[in-house]
From Swiss-Prot:
Reactions catalysed, as given in the entry: XMP + diphosphate = xanthine + 5-phospho-alpha-D-ribose 1-diphosphate
Keyword Transmembrane helix in record: no
Protein name stated in the entry: Xanthine phosphoribosyltransferase
E.C. numbers: 2.4.2.22
Subunit structure: Homodimer.
InterPro entries registered for this protein in UniProt: PRibTrfase_dom, PRTase-like, Pur/Pyrimidine_PRTase, Xanthine_PRibTrfase
Compartments (UniProt record): Cytoplasm
HAMAP family on file: XPRTase
GO molecular function: xanthine phosphoribosyltransferase activity
PANTHER family, sorted: HYPOXANTHINE/GUANINE PHOSPHORIBOSYLTRANSFERASE, XANTHINE PHOSPHORIBOSYLTRANSFERASE
Family under the similarity heading: Belongs to the purine/pyrimidine phosphoribosyltransferase family. Xpt subfamily.
Designated gene of the protein: xpt
Amino acid sequence: MENLHKRILEEGQALSNDVLKVDSFLNHQVDADLMYEMGTYFKNYFKDHNITKIFTIESSGIAPTVMTAMQMNLPMVILKKQGSKILKGDVYQTTVHSFTKGTDYELTLQKKYINEDDNILIIDDFLANGEAALGAARLVEGAGAKVAGIGIVIEKSFQPGPKLLEEKGYDVYSLARIEKLEKGIIKIKK
């Protein structure tokens, strides 16, 4: 996805060998046109996967997921990271370690938003160690549903997540694959 690659190279900041800051268009200020284009790419790739719902994890995956759900005319579910008085009782939960924040959180899904017949597309902003995507997949599979695919905006190909998801047999489609990060240097796989 050439527009995304261009934005990463022009506006992204490699803060270290494993941290890429893209807050000018993805996770602080959001470029709606770019999100719409991402939705088109995800729709085109996953259109024959018999998807029934699209899941994302709050919060940075929401914008590209909304655009994908709109274009595929499918419901979208936001998996919650924060505890809430509203999310009690009939829920699925799993513990996930956040690479970015260095902490664990409980990923939560209300049972009423999934059933055994669902084929779920999971979309997230980053794939690093694979913890978030695997946590979402655990919730889906724990409900007896199927993970139809995983859409990633930016994959850090040099970290363990991509290989881990591949070994588990998931169909992963990444819009940008970062080959290498060094302070001030970003290299994208073509």
